[in-house]
């Protein structure tokens, strides 16, 4: 499977393969509250490659925000999806034992190390500023709806 950063934001194709190895779960995993949003605070162990766990999380969720708890841009992005009444998965990198390895993997996947790193419908759309721009242009919600439509069709089969 190939994921690409949205053409709306513009950049290169990023090859990524889905893998069944490693899940974004761990003994200290917690669930967020409100609107079904969830947070991962622990992501397994170092033996499981961060890239595989990132890929699986992105594949299993329509909206994923890789964040840090102290990041104001991350809060801005989470608030945007909350205000849009869109469920999302949050992975707080600073709460993970191997958070720096996950951030390194995200850097290799997206070309940028900063947070937030936001994926919608398996597509990297950028950071908070990119996401807000897509929303103002009326392009963000259609991306989210595409994912929900795809998931609905998958459930019908």
From Swiss-Prot:
Key words, A-Z = 2Fe-2S, Disulfide bond, Electron transport, Glutathionylation, Iron, Iron-sulfur, Metal-binding, Mitochondrion, Phosphoprotein, Redox-active center, Transit peptide, Transport
Which positions carry S-glutathionyl cysteine?
A: 71
Query: One GO term of the cellular component aspect?
Result: mitochondrion
Which PANTHER family does the protein's record reference?
GLUTAREDOXIN-2, MITOCHONDRIAL (PTHR46679:SF1), PTHR46679
Compartment(s) of residence: Mitochondrion
* Protein's name in the database: Glutaredoxin-2, mitochondrial
Q: Which gene encodes it?
A: GLRX2
Is Electron transport one of the keywords UniProt gives this record? yes
Highest taxon of the source?
Eukaryota
Q: Which CDD domains match?
A: GRX_GRXh_1_2_like
What are the Glutaredoxin domain coordinates in residue numbering?
51-151
Disulphide bond pairs: 71-74
Q: Which residues carry this modification: Phosphoserine?
A: 20
Stretch forming the transit peptide: 1-18
Short name of any one Pfam family annotated for the protein: Glutaredoxin
């Amino acid at each position: 499977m190939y994921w690409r950063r949205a053409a709306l934001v513009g950049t290169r194709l990023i090859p990524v393969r889905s893998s069944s190895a490693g899940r974004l779960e761990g003994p200290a995993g917690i669930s967020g509250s409100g609107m079904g949003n969830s947070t991962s605070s622990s992501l397994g162990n170092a033996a499981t490659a961060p890239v595989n766990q990132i890929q699986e999380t992105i594949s299993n969720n329509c909206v994923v925000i890789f964040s840090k708890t102290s990041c104001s841009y991350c809060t801005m992005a989470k608030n945007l999806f909350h205000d849009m009444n869109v469920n999302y998965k949050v992975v707080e990198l600073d709460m993970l034992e191997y958070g720096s390895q996950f951030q390194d993997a995200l850097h290799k996947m997206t070309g940028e190390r900063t947070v937030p790193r936001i994926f919608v419908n398996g597509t990297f759309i950028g950071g908070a500023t990119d996401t807000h721009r897509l929303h103002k242009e009326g392009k963000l919600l259609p991306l989210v709806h595409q994912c929900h439509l795809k998931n609905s069709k998958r459930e019908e089969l």
